[in-house]
Amino acid sequence: MAGMKEIRGKIKSVQNTRKITKAMEMVAASKMRRAQERMRAARPYAEKVRAIAAHMSRANPEYRHPFMVANEGVKTAGMILVTTDKGLCGGLNTNVLRASLQKFKELEEKGQKVEATAIGGKGLGFLNRFGAKVISQVVHLGDTPHLDKLIGAVKTQLDLYSEGRLSAVYLAYTRFVNTMKQETVIEQLLPLSSEHFDANDGTPATSWDYIYEPDAQAVVDELLVRYVEALVYQAVAENMASEQSARMVAMKAASDNAKTVISELQLSYNKSRQAAITKELSEIVGGAAAV
């Protein structure tokens, strides 16, 4: 009977755990939908800023913003690492951290040191354990990222690049593909390549004309900063949507596994109970036969 009592305790424990994982699955599903809406809402802003900056760059080919010029001979690179603040989201953080570590090693092999910006507590913890130089950080963003919380940390990297102290700035995050699939991405944020300003939106280069105040150069300077900030914000929004999707899938898998364990424990309990009843009946029959 002690075995049956122990099994009942295990069943109760797993049932309680399943209630928690099921609740977390539903919460993650709700947050995922909101995160996807924010992610989609951020895309038109970044695209419109890109289109305007592209038009102005074509209209003023003689001016090259520092973000569009490679800093040759510099032995330090920047890395903006976007992760989550919380765990329980499958291998999402592990994948981006592994890819970032590989990028660190590649840069070191080329004689490049790395100065990192951490967005998210998991990435900050990784960088500290790895011994990387962290020059800025943002943690505890919550479920709704705000650009004003990111600007300070991101500006540190942008200023260093503008001053010619970084050879490049890389952005590492998890891109949202769909609920079941997320991709680890490490892309070059600075210097901006010509791909950022290709006329792929179907708008002819001569289709608009503006009067720029105070002058076109000042507007380009401000626009490119806003564009890079929008790229980072988009990466954070994509990462948050990926986080909630991965957490929902992980919690669903945990709930399904708990259900399987409960079924197996219930079967063990029934077998133990049947064995105990059979033993009691055998003892009764044996006692009656002895009489």
From Swiss-Prot:
Family annotation (Pfam families): ATP-synt
Localization: Cell inner membrane
Entry's Gene Ontology BP terms: proton motive force-driven plasma membrane ATP synthesis
CDD domains given in the database record: F1-ATPase_gamma
Keywords: ATP synthesis, Cell inner membrane, Cell membrane, CF(1), Hydrogen ion transport, Ion transport, Membrane, Transport
Function: Produces ATP from ADP in the presence of a proton gradient across the membrane. The gamma chain is believed to be important in regulating ATPase activity and the flow of protons through the CF(0) complex.
Family per record: Belongs to the ATPase gamma chain family.
Oligomer and partners: F-type ATPases have 2 components, CF(1) - the catalytic core - and CF(0) - the membrane proton channel. CF(1) has five subunits: alpha(3), beta(3), gamma(1), delta(1), epsilon(1). CF(0) has three main subunits: a, b and c.
The protein, known as: ATP synthase gamma chain
The organism of origin for this protein: Burkholderia thailandensis (strain ATCC 700388 / DSM 13276 / CCUG 48851 / CIP 106301 / E264)
Upper lineage: Bacteria, Pseudomonadati, Pseudomonadota, Betaproteobacteria, Burkholderiales
Gene name in the database record: atpG
